[in-house]
Amino acid sequence: MCFCLSACGSGLSAGLEAYQSPDGRYGFFYPTGWTRIKVDGGPEIIYHDIINSNETLSLVVSDIDKDVQLEQLGSPSEVGQTLIDKVIAPEGSGRSVKLINADKRELSNHVFYDLEYELILNNQDRHELATVVVDRGSIYTFAVGTNQERWNKVEKMFTNVVESFNFLI
């Protein structure tokens, strides 16, 4: 309840809907009108825009040693580069990715690494924002992206979406 009330009161949630995990552990906002889809073996959560289907939001949750803190994995830039090398564009994938920005942010006793990428996938230029955070033996990677042509129209909203990811308990 605090998640929605604090975010709604800030005015940053215009055009966004709230999502809370079934166990109440985390929540975030996603763009109004987007649809959740399920992909076997894929991310824990995926939403996409019905009209602009290449606009997507995803949450990947992976196990990590319970004693590991995010800062132990490296700086924001190092973690961003590791994501590029191992997940987004591993060798042989044919993808080209550039890390544009990497920052550290703290919220509710958690450290978040906010990342911004430009990607070339199958001759399509994309722009993505992601945040990475560690909590209770899991590493969460929450990302939202679109094609480069729409980036300027959705940049502020996507920034609000990525920064809305938070732990509620």
Where are these regions (language model features)?
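Soluble non-cytosolic domains of exported or imported proteins
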Residues: 25, 73-81, 148, 152-156
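Bacterial signal peptide processing site
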Residues: 9-11
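Conserved polar/disulfide-associated segments of primarily extracytoplasmic proteins
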Residues: 37-133, 139
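Short acidic-hydrophobic surface loop/beta-edge motif
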Residues: 17-22, 103-106
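Surface-exposed amphipathic alpha-helical segments
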Residues: 34, 138-169
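C-terminal motif of bacterial Sec signal peptides marking the signal peptidase cleavage site
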Residues: 4-7
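Proline-anchored loop/turn motifs at beta-strand termini and strand-loop-strand connectors
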Residues: 23-40
